[in-house]
Amino acid sequence: MDRRHEKYDRLIERCKQNEPVPCAVAHPCDESSLRGAVEAAQMGLIVPILCGPRARIAKVAADCGLDISRFEIVDAEHSHASAEAAVRLAREGKAAVVMKGSLHTDELMAAVVNRDTGLRTSRRISHCFVMDVPALDRVLIITDAAVNIFPTLEDKVDIVQNAIDLALVLRPDRQPRVAILSAMETVNPKVPSTIEAAALCKMAERGQITGGLLDGPLALDNAVDLAAAKIKKIDSPVAGQADILVVPDLEAGNMLAKSLTFMAEADAAGIVLGTRVPIILTSRADSLIARLASCAVASLVAAARRAQATKAVS
């Protein structure tokens, strides 16, 4: 086991215990997206349904030496049609997961959020990075760094709840510790994120957010480092040992996630929640292990939802 990726390796091994889930891959028309889907299938994580221009997908596979003969292809003329086809498969119950291929995130999300034909639910849609940071002994969830640009307090309630629900799937034996981040750990009327952090914590106390332990505002250092929390004399079950970092806005979250990736050798698996099915958002810069981990996370979420639905009707 590669110690740098040991947390991802454990997730992938756990996922292999389940049946592979049908996954609609939207426009896998370059090597990285097609190879990621094929290798995830070879590891037993997903059963890909390739949505895109048939001839173009076949050419990429031939050029890269990838065998896609056993995978279904849903022919779609262009990237917009590929996104719509993948979403349609999810709506029809033929796919339990949707994966982004070589199209722009906005193209896929436009199909996802369509009020008539998309995958909306009563929840706010949000994104979670599931990060394997070598310096930490646990997987770290960062939200929201990709979908909600300037979320309101109301938006953040769903963002936090989506992240807690994800953490409980990944670690059912551990109550998630949620740090609501700001630039400081005291409430300052001049810094709106500190007021929202305090409000979210009170909402959790009142049962408006469930399943996790919340604390905030917390600065990044005293959210993830026990020594920093002790120096600041912050006494809470979250400080220094957060599993989830809730950022004030997309800009802060994106910079935090990319800083960990490019300066701390972390890998970032990405998943969108608050939709009918989990959606894997990958980047062309993602490593293969990050792509596989994204598939594993989405597969575990899909399996948990399937088990919950079965329990509800039994």
Describe the function of each predicted region.
Residues 1-49, 53-238, 243-314:
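Anion-binding alpha/beta catalytic cores of soluble intermediary-metabolism enzymes, centered on
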